[in-house]
């Protein structure tokens, strides 16, 4: 379910519900810089960080996907609440959109 609440900021972009678990994901999209040492930001707002950290502390499954033209990187739990990664490291973690979709499906469904 795509979420948008103009009265309560910070809620994750999408909520997935399955027979195994629920999963809240915040999506970010970046154009990757050309230089390997340039940092790919994880631009979460303070409210987004607070919301994800709070739900994670409650035992809920949360994560951040930083997408780009080539695919995306999955940051489970609150690991996506950091400052970012150098392009070279980001590319090393990059998976395809199909792999991301399968990861999400396996996280919520038996």
Regions found by a protein language model. Give the residues of each.
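A short acidic, often aromatic-flanked loop/helix-cap motif at beta-alpha or helix-coil junctions
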Residues: 6-10, 71-72, 95, 100
């Amino acid at each position: 379910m795509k979420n948008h609440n103009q009265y309560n900021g910070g809620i994750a972009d999408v909520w997935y519900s399955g027979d195994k678990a629920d999963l809240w994901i915040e999506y970010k999209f970046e154009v990757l810089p050309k230089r390997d040492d340039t940092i790919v930001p994880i631009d979460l707002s303070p409210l987004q960080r607070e919301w994800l950290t709070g739900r994670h502390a409650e035992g809920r499954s949360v994560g951040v996907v930083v997408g780009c033209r080539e695919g995306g990187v999955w940051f489970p739990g609150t690991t996506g609440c950091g400052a970012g990664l150098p392009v070279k490291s980001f590319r090393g973690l990059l998976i395809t959109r199909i792999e991301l979709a399968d990861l999400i499906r396996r996280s919520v469904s038996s």
